[in-house]
């Protein structure tokens, strides 16, 4: 990274970002560059004025390579957007990438994965959420009966209290038994 990028983020702000994330100074500057590339004039103008809370709207954010092809991009943006609008500040974007980094603990990843897959935001993953999850993963190409069968199996295997929903604790327990989860819930920086 050249001096032009680091000059836009104060040393104090870089230190704060390093304390609040799992990233090095160099990684933060690299992440800043990808954020800036969404709308260079808007970001540079705000950062030069010391405004690190400039927001990219959802349509700009989903152009990021890390999100562009994800079937969950709308949920990811909403969950990591401080106001749940899907619009993101650089801090929101940095938080998202930090949680999805290989350095983030599995518990933190699990908590955010739960929020992303809780499509109706009712603090549990129910049949409707699981239908949506399976449909998104498969590109909405499965028959309803097949999706229902998969959802039935998920609930049979994972719903410990047999109430038809997965709590955050049940969901986290499932993910702890899944060694590939951390690697799959990952965005390389």
Regions found by a protein language model. Give the residues of each.
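Acidic carboxylate motifs that coordinate Ca2+ or other divalent cations, activating on Asp/Glu
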Residues: 85, 122, 161-163
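Amphipathic regulatory helices of Ca2+-sensor modules
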Residues: 47-68, 88-101, 115-116, 125-142, ...
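Eukaryote-specific detector of the first structured module of a protein
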Residues: 1-72, 77, 82
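Calcium-binding motifs, dominated by EF-hand helix-loop-helix domains
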Residues: 38, 79-80, 115-119, 156-158
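Bromodomain acetyl-lysine reader domains
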Residues: 70, 110-113
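Short pre-active-site segment immediately N-terminal to the catalytic Zn-binding motif
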Residues: 104-108
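C-terminal interaction modules of eukaryotic adaptor/scaffold proteins
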Residues: 12, 154-189
């Amino acid at each position: 990274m050249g001096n032009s990028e680091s000059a836009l983020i104060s040393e104090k702000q870089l230190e704060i970002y390093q304390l609040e994330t799992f990233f090095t100074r160099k990684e933060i500057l690299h992440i800043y560059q990808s954020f800036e590339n969404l709308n260079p004039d808007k970001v540079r103008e705000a950062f030069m004025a010391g405004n690190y809370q400039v927001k990219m709207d959802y349509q700009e954010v989903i152009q990021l390579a890390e999100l562009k092809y994800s079937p969950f991009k709308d949920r990811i943006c909403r969950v990591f957007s401080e106001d749940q609008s899907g619009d993101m500040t650089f801090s929101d974007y940095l938080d998202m990438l930090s949680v999805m980094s290989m350095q983030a603990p599995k518990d933190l990843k699990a908590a955010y994965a739960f929020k992303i897959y809780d499509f109706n935001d009712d603090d549990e993953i129910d049949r409707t959420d699981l239908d949506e999850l399976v449909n998104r993963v498969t590109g909405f190409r499965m028959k309803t009966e097949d999706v229902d069968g998969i959802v039935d199996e998920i609930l049979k295997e994972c719903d410990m209290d047999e109430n038809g929903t997965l709590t955050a604790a049940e969901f986290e327990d499932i993910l702890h038994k899944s060694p590939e989860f951390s690697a799959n819930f990952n965005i390389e920086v």
